[in-house]
Regions:
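Negatively charged
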Residues: 1-457
């Protein structure tokens, strides 16, 4: 019996199928397409593929996708020299513990999008035999606007080791979400990565909470435009060396180091951010959000002239004592909600270079924090350049800034402010300088315990 050349979806959605054994009389030597052959065979526990001849197969995309009860798939004798796509091949094989791909020839493969995504029981995988000179895709694109793209090893939550030392990424465009949520992965050898064509490394190590060091010295980032959430929730990382990064084409760094709660220092003085528009995002968090152990941060080279979003950029950086933002120019800034909230060790902050003329809201409703709320060590704050004519929301703006003795708000216009709850909550009596009687009336309405002084022009 000869299987048809196009054997795509041959057993797709056979949800009651538990056992498959191919006899020697089932001839697959002429088969070109095995796409989705066992797709969503959700009850399949035993699959004998030893007699299959796959030497002419070109397409193996989604071949075993969704076979959630298979614990092992033996394809160790397969000849895959003609295969061009392994797209989603083992995706969603959530019971798969071992996988032998030692015979695979991947020299003609162009697409490995999400090949192993969702293999949540897989502990180790050796792909050292994989040669990928033609590899273009390792990401599966989203099917609709609200779903994310899916990366090569995404949600391989038990994966501790992976050997991809012979991969060639020289033609690959995106490494987005490559190791997303590989939370047990303790080390990755990236020394052989050729990333000269890569434009997207967003969320590449997102949720890799066991990675202690990440060596990116070989990374060529000259074409990269998206670095958002690259190291998000890398909670064990104590050293991330990005000193050789070329960031001249990057447009978003939102959440890049967010939740890297073990980082103590970060030198980004080499970063060229002239094209960056987003250092934060309202959906998620800011670039350094919750870097709670960060004591030293060098952003002296940052060009922020094109930035429009700094949402929660430094929020929860509780160990940061100094922050030099004197180079920050912000003519296009529209979002800075809770930008410095909970920077409880920060002693001084000079924002005299900031242009806030396009800002309307300064607080974050989801976390009930304000722009400077809980900056309890702050003794000096320069907001003399603030243009607040369009601001309507100043909720908890200076709440619990308990070390401030005086505050010059003489540039502030409160005429459009409608939300101001807990504006000065928790502050001891101190002097606030305002420009006119209307401003003084506003402060007295907000907190009658504050000593408000009209500053003469």
């Amino acid at each position: 019996m000869y299987a048809p050349e196009n054997s795509a979806n041959l057993f797709k959605n056979f949800t009651s199928l538990t056992n498959v054994t191919f006899s020697k009389y089932f001839n697959t030597s002429n088969v070109i397409n095995m796409q989705g052959m066992f797709y969503d065979c959700t009850s399949l526990t035993n699959l004998d593929l030893t007699s299959l001849d796959v030497k002419n197969v070109v397409n193996m995309s989604s071949m075993f996708r969704g076979c959630s009860k298979l614990t092992t798939i033996d394809v160790g004798n397969w000849n895959t020299k003609n295969v061009t796509t392994f797209h989603d091949m083992f995706r969603g094989n959530s019971s798969l513990k071992t996988l032998n791909l030692s015979s695979f020839d991947t020299t003609n493969v162009t697409d490995m999008g999400a090949m192993f995504a969702g293999c949540s029981k897989l502990e180790t995988i050796d792909l050292s035999n994989f040669k990928t000179p033609n590899l273009i895709k390792i990401v599966t694109p989203k099917y609709n606007d609200w779903d994310p793209n899916v990366g090569l090893f995404e949600n391989c939550t038990s994966l501790e080791q992976v050997n991809i030392s012979n991969f060639d990424f020289s033609k690959t465009i995106s490494l987005e979400r490559m190791f997303y949520n590989c939370k047990l992965l303790s080390s990755i050898d990236l020394s052989t990565f050729n990333t000269e064509s890569v434009t997207n490394i967003a969320s590449m190590f997102y949720g890799c909470s066991k990675l202690a060091t990440i060596d990116l010295k070989k990374f060529n980032t000259s074409k990269v435009t998206d670095m958002s959430f690259m190291f998000y929730n890398c909670t064990s990382a104590s050293n991330i060396d990005t000193s050789l990064f070329d960031t001249s084409n990057v447009t978003t760094m939102a959440g890049m180091f967010a939740n890297c709660s073990n980082l103590k220092s970060l030198d980004l003085s080499n970063f060229n951010t002239k094209n960056v528009k987003a250092f934060g995002t309202i959906t998620w968090r800011g670039m350094f959000y919750n870097c709670s152990k960060l004591e030293e941060l060098n952003v002296s080279s940052f060009d922020t002239s094109n930035a429009n979003n700094m949402y929660m950029m430094f929020a929860n950086c509780r160990s940061l004592k100094k922050l030099d933002l004197s180079n920050f120019k912000t003519p296009n800034l529209t979002s800075m909600e809770s930008m410095f909230a909970n920077c409880s060790s920060l002693e001084s902050l000079d924002l005299s270079s900031f242009d806030t003329s396009k800002i309307t809201i300064t607080s974050d409703d989801s976390s009930t924090t304000g722009l400077f709320s809980d900056c309890s060590s702050l003794t000096s704050l320069n907001v003399s350049s603030f243009n607040t004519e369009k601001m309507t929301d100043m909720k908890r703006m200076f709440a619990n800034c308990s070390s401030l003795k005086s505050l010059d708000l003489s540039s502030f216009d409160f005429s459009n402010v409608t939300r101001y709850i807990e504006f000065f909550k928790g502050n001891v009596s101190f002097n606030v300088y305002v420009k006119d009687q209307a401003s003084k009336d506003f402060i007295n309405k907000v907190d009658s315990g504050i000593n408000c002084v009209i500053k003469e022009a």
